């Protein structure tokens, strides 16, 4: 949630009536649907593999978490992010019982890189590519008749920023139903940037481990159908959205600010009308980078205080890689599945937690089984764009 708006339903200190999630969809390196992704994560399966999309000889790092859908090894094609986005939205809409005509439904998309990979292939290699294909709205209009399409490029918290806007639209009466999605794919430029800033090239993502070396990117898309709570009669409810809080602390271009992250946690709890001790599960941002994991752990320690060891915690980027703008919404879908099933995926590769997180209840080894009601989902990005959501289990 952003700063207070003028209408009472969106006042920053007023808990919102929960909106309901009535459909979910996802595709990434560990699965082709939301249910398949969750099953893979609970089994501890990782999408990590040798880099396939471009020439490994140009980089120190040699691995990534890619969707293996290219026509031939070592080659790449345009439009992959758009195809995954459409696929995730199709699944979520089908799950919600919506038809193919989404002309009346706002679609809000969070992305860090959009179709930058297609632009790279077009500009450098001469691949056939029309500039209109950079915009997801073109494909969504053609496939679903969508005309109210919004794109948010807020780095790694983009899809939760989109969720905040979608929540505000519902609260303000601008729509009864919205679709919120997130998507990103590996690009050579971003992979190269990360390859240069790491002191040592990481071979896997190991969030909160003392020996972590950095982040590796992953492909993926996620989507949910969100409906106002008072208009959800007859819907099969996946879970409740209690709050989304966003801020931009502007602390540094890339380094996180503990105070800014902590403010986002406090804001999400306040808007949800809950206390830190009420949270049963934390879906960590957990990128496996030196600064980010430390800052996230310190912020949680400050906000949760004596209760920091209570909730189960996990970081699924250890299996999916960092899916950038889509990662926050993927975390939310996993959180909803965990609340519903009582299963929490493990953090793969976490052997010895960093000192700042020594008292946390990390899920390690195998998935955990627990009775869960409330989950917190974290997403933080470059420039201090922080977003935190709180979701609740739907009572059957």
Give the label of every model feature segment.
Residues 8-13, 95-108, 138-148, 171-178, ...:
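Structural signature of cysteine-dependent C-C bond-forming condensing enzymes
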Residues 18, 25, 121, 147-164, ...:
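Cysteine-centered functional microenvironments
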Residues 21-23, 41, 89, 107, ...:
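Conserved small-residue
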Residues 5, 13-16, 49-83, 114-167, ...:
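Conserved catalytic cysteine-centered active-site region
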Residues 3-5, 10, 14, 30, ...:
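Conserved active-site "lid/cap" helical segment
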Residues 32, 36, 76, 80-87, ...:
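Conserved active-site and cofactor/substrate-binding residues in soluble primary-metabolism enzymes
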Residues 18-22, 27, 34-35, 39-62, ...:
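Condensing-enzyme catalytic core mediating Claisen C-C bond formation in acyl metabolism
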């Amino acid at each position: 949630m952003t700063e207070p708006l003028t209408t009472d339903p969106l006042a920053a200190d007023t808990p919102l009536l929960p909106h309901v999630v009535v459909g979910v969809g996802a595709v990434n390196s560990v699965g082709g649907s939301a249910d398949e992704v969750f099953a893979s994560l609970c089994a501890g399966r990782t999408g990590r593999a040798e880099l396939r999309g471009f020439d490994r000889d140009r980089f120190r790092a040699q691995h990534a978490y890619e969707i293996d859908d290219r026509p031939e090894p070592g080659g790449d094609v345009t439009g992959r992010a758009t195809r995954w986005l459409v696929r995730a939205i199709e699944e979520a809409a089908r799950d919600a019982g919506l038809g193919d005509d989404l002309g009346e439904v706002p679609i809000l998309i969070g992305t860090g890189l959009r179709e930058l990979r297609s632009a790279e292939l077009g500009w450098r290699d001469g691949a056939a590519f029309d500039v209109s294909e950079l915009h997801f709205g073109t494909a969504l209009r053609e496939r679903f008749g969508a005309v109210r399409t919004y794109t948010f490029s807020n780095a790694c918290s983009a899809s939760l920023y989109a969720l905040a806007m979608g929540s505000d639209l519902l609260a303000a009466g601008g729509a009864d139903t919205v679709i919120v999605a997130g998507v990103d794919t590996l690009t050579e430029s971003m992979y190269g940037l990360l390859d240069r800033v790491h002191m040592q090239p990481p071979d896997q993502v190991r969030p909160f481990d003392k020996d972590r070396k950095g982040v590796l990117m992953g492909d993926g898309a996620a989507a949910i159908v969100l409906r106002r709570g008072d208009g959800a009669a007859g819907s099969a409810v996946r879970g409740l959205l209690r709050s989304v809080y966003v801020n931009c602390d502007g602390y540094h271009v890339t380094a996180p600010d503990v105070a800014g992250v902590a403010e986002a946690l406090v804001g999400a709890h306040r808007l949800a009308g809950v206390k830190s001790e009420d949270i049963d599960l934390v879906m960590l941002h957990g990128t496996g980078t030196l600064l980010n994991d430390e800052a996230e752990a310190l912020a949680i320690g400050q906000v949760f205080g004596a209760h920091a060891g209570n909730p189960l915690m996990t970081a699924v980027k250890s299996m999916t890689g960092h899916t950038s703008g889509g990662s926050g919404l993927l975390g939310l879908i996993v959180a909803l599945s965990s609340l519903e099933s009582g299963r929490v995926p493990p953090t793969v590769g976490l052997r010895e937690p960093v000192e700042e997180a020594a008292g946390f209840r990390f899920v390690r080894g195998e998935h955990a089984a627990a009775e869960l009601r409330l989950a917190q989902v974290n997403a933080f990005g470059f420039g201090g764009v922080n977003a935190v959501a709180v979701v609740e289990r739907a009572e059957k």
